[in-house]
Amino acid sequence: MTTQAPPTSLLPLTPEQLARLQAAIGEYSPTQLAWLSGYFWGMVNQQPGSVAIAPVASAAASITVISASQTGNARRLAEQLRDDLLAAKLSVTLVNAGDYKFKQIAQERLLVIVASTQGEGEPAEEAVALHKFLFSKKAPKLNETAFAVFGLGDTSYENFCQSGKDFDGKLAELGAERLVERVDADVEYQELATAWRKQVVEVLKARAPAENAAPGVLASGAVDLLDSSPYSKEQPLTAQLAVKQKITGRASDKDVRHIEIDLGDSGLRYRPGDALGVWFDNDPALVDELVQLLWLKGDEPVEVEGKTLPLAQALRSHFELTQNTTPIVDKYAALSRDEKLIGLLADKAALQHYAHNTPIVDMVRQAPADLNAEQLIGLLRPLTPRLYSIASSQAENENEVHVTVGVVRYDIDGRARAGGASSFLADRLEEDGDVRVFIEHNDNFRLPANPETPVIMIGPGTGIAPFRAFMQQRDADGAGGKNWLFFGNPHFTEDFLYQVEWQRYVKDGLLTRIDLAWSRDQQHKVYVQDKLREQGAEVWRWIQEGAHIYVCGDANRMAKDVENTLLELVAEHGGMDTELADEFLSELRLERRYQRDVY
């Protein structure tokens, strides 16, 4: 591969260094060069006290791919597209949405966005600032820009792929040209993604001349040494359950488990802020119930990923049984010809409510149908792993990973139901039993690089998990920065998760402040946002001192309430109006001083 070097005056290299570099890279492919660019960028960022030098933009880097990822799927797809474009000898820059300088969007000529959706149709956390900018009055006209959008979502949520729809619609509204039609993909997105990637490459080959091709720098810092693990979502590590302990009281309405998994000598590495992906098997009793309701035996042969398996085994290990969706209800209504289900199809809100509140097995019980094994399999979605915020640091627990699991339990018509993964970990997986796991790295939820920086942690319920990891890491590092925890749950006596550990951190001086909100211990309900509001003046002082703010937990209610409270206290104590307070919080996001891990 040959490239035209930029003027040496623009490079932080001597002519001799540049000559050695050009000689060294001659044997590498474009894809390998792109990987190396991220690898060396990651090395620079890992060196204490180093100053990152902004890469010089190549005039040939005419395609920008933005990854707006929540659980890693959008990032992986964006990386695959980047590799496809490089293989086609096209110039491409891949950038994490959280690192994208969105005010430069008016200069983009060819733009591709791979966007996931979280919560109630909101953009991925790393894309919030970009989304806000595009929907603000400051968004520029994009008459010279051409774009493509791939949306990732989950049809079990009402606002399916809303983030992708938002980006696609707004870019067009701002005058940009749509290169290809937007794709809205469910959890089983691989086939759609493969076809879309091919289409995008062909379209871009006609728009971006290949003779000028040069691999773009991964603006996000891309490849990290921790990402070089042989284990992944597709090839998980088989680890062993070491500890399973209930950490809520007997009288608690919540069943929360502290789970410790032994990684052995696997070499699997993670950082505070990362998530643990857990593969699970469905409850055999649930499988039997579903099979019997459909008058099947369970030994019928079915095809799954090119293999022939007995139906019961396929249902246990390959398909989602605990999460219903509107497309499943739609398909089952047609198969069962049930009048009640057919009546729901005309009412979107009623259909969504039914799918959300009625497990598949109960839908079948309420509306019996005569299905064969293949029809049943065709109705269901593939099993997907669940992600749990990691509650430990390898600085303290080198060969272990801990998670905090809220077990989902409820009744439907007097029958006990439970979450697929949470009940697997709590009820069916025995100590020393095998569990398949992988690490989902989350660079959008990281402790400050400077150990002297103050930290404010807001995590009610199981949202406390990553902050246990944060404190273990700060303790091991001897970090001098102040630490403030806001935690809440229904009852002090039953629901104070990791109480002894927090009390020890307070006693040792590591945890500077702790504010606790017990919503059911008094007549009026008190939540973490109420405690945050009470301490508004002091929170503002910490922010002025450079504090980083972290929020973990429920995306639909808690995280929104906390953000509104932060806006209120910034406006009140910072002397700003609502618009300026919102801009201030957006700046904190861009500076990585306001980070959220919400779900």
Curated annotation (Swiss-Prot):
A matching Pfam family: Flavodoxin_1
Cofactor: FAD; FMN
Disulphide bond pairs: none
Source species, domain of life: Bacteria
FAD-binding FR-type domain location: 234-448
Co-factor binding comment: Binds 1 FAD per subunit. Binds 1 FMN per subunit.
Keywords, comma-separated and alphabetical: Amino-acid biosynthesis, Cysteine biosynthesis, Electron transport, FAD, Flavoprotein, FMN, NADP, Oxidoreductase, Transport
GO CC terms of this entry: cytosol
Pathway: Sulfur metabolism; hydrogen sulfide biosynthesis; hydrogen sulfide from sulfite (NADPH route): step 1/1
Sequence positions that bind NADP(+): 519-520, 525-529, 561
Biological processes, Gene Ontology terms: cysteine biosynthetic process; hydrogen sulfide biosynthetic process; sulfate assimilation
Documented EC number(s): 1.8.1.2
Entry's Gene Ontology molecular function annotations: flavin adenine dinucleotide binding; FMN binding; sulfite reductase (NADPH) activity
UniProt-annotated binding residues for FAD: 322, 356, 386-389, 404-406, 410, 419-422, 599
Positions bound to FMN: 69-74, 116-119, 152-161
Sequence ranges assigned to domain Flavodoxin-like in this UniProt record: 63-201
Gene3D superfamilies (alphabetical): 3.40.50.360, NADPH-cytochrome p450 Reductase, Chain A, domain 3 (1.20.990.10), Nucleotide-binding domain of ferredoxin-NADP reductase (FNR) module (3.40.50.80), Translation factors (2.40.30.10)
Catalytic function, reaction form: hydrogen sulfide + 3 NADP(+) + 3 H2O = sulfite + 3 NADPH + 4 H(+)
Record's keyword annotation contains Protein biosynthesis: no
Assembly information from the UniProt record: Alpha(8)-beta(8). The alpha component is a flavoprotein, the beta component is a hemoprotein.
Family statement drawn from the similarity comment of this UniProt entry: Belongs to the NADPH-dependent sulphite reductase flavoprotein subunit CysJ family. In the N-terminal section; belongs to the flavodoxin family.
Free-text function comment from the UniProt entry: Component of the sulfite reductase complex that catalyzes the 6-electron reduction of sulfite to sulfide. This is one of several activities required for the biosynthesis of L-cysteine from sulfate. The flavoprotein component catalyzes the electron flow from NADPH -> FAD -> FMN to the hemoprotein component.
Name of the protein in its database record: Sulfite reductase [NADPH] flavoprotein alpha-component
Organism, as annotated: Serratia proteamaculans (strain 568)
Gene: cysJ
